[in-house]
């Protein structure tokens, strides 16, 4: 059985905006991962990186409630990394 590891990589508060990221290093073929903004912040934009040539992004978009960024990817059944990041700003 494959263990899925998801973690927040970093969160830095820099002059009114925050960068957040999540990483999945599992061996799952079909993955959905979200980078979630801190409370009282909304997502301004987001993105991703993948580490395998055969992995494909099928979805990259903000969450409907504005609380983060979601990416869906499909890749091989061996280890590859999906990283999702988001830029969050003060909710005003």
Identify the role of each PLM range.
Residues 1-92:
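Extracellular attachment/recognition segments
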